[in-house]
């Protein structure tokens, strides 16, 4: 069971999510490899809608943290999030 994912960015439009993920992938291809992004729309009420770009598929918190640490060492901010079942 994949209980964790790594959030890379949170932006205002699906187009921006796609564009920014392409930039992140180009810079971090050796880390991200062929992992597919998952874009989640989140409505934050007064703050509006955001599109969060995540890399899913981590079975453990440790695996997600290790992946995020690699990204951070390469200059990419990220956040480990638990998948809501």
Segments (PLM) and residue ranges:
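Long, low-complexity, acidic/serine-threonine-proline-glutamine-glycine-rich intrinsically disordered tracts
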Residues: 1-4, 30
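A short beta-strand micro-motif
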Residues: 6-8, 53
């Amino acid at each position: 069971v994949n209980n964790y994912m790594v959030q890379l960015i949170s932006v205002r439009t699906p187009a921006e999510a796609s564009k920014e993920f392409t930039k992140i992938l180009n810079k971090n291809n050796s880390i991200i490899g062929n992992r597919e992004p998952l874009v989640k729309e989140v409505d934050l009420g007064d703050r509006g809608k955001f599109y969060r770009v995540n890399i899913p598929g981590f079975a453990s918190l440790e695996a997600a943290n290790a992946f995020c640490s690699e990204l951070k060492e390469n200059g990419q901010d990220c956040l480990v999030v638990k998948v809501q079942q």
